[in-house]
Amino acid sequence: KWNKTHPDDQAKLTEPQYAGTSSEGGSKAAEALMAANPKLDALIPAGGGGDPLQGAIAAVERAGKTGKIAVVSTDFLPDLGERLKNGSMAGQSGGHYCDPLIAFMTVYNAIKGNYKDFEGKFEDITFPYLFVASPDDYQGYEKYFVKQLPFTDQELVDMSNLSLEGLKEAATKISIEDAAARFGK
């Protein structure tokens, strides 16, 4: 779809480069991609925000292409706010707070007996990843998901009484914007 609607900005996907689980692997994969594609303007180190991502960022920095190659990935880095400011990261998805919270609330409600005929069934609860693409986005994430809980004490109590469908609905709404709106900010 992108290429059809953006004829002057064609996206070209490269063959994946396996980086392993080390910083060195991420660095070598990024270097290989940059060497094979001199016009490379975006890089998506997959597999999380750990060592391979750090290595890829370092390779882009060594090549003098910080800000020229947009780097995006998953799993928030501890210094993501600074990286968004200096241009070494263009965006990142992650902030998996909602996954353990919703899992805990599901188990808690099941143990309390709030879910009838639940035994042996599989339920899929979908929730959006949090996405940050600017220092302001990161400040919102840090404020509502790192420095405090994204829910008030009363909201957590209310959540502990939700039906499974209600919990699924609550999960779909989790976002930085939702937390800010609920806290009136």
Label each residue range with its predicted role.
Residues 1-185:
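A residue-level marker of the well-folded mature domains of exported/periplasmic proteins
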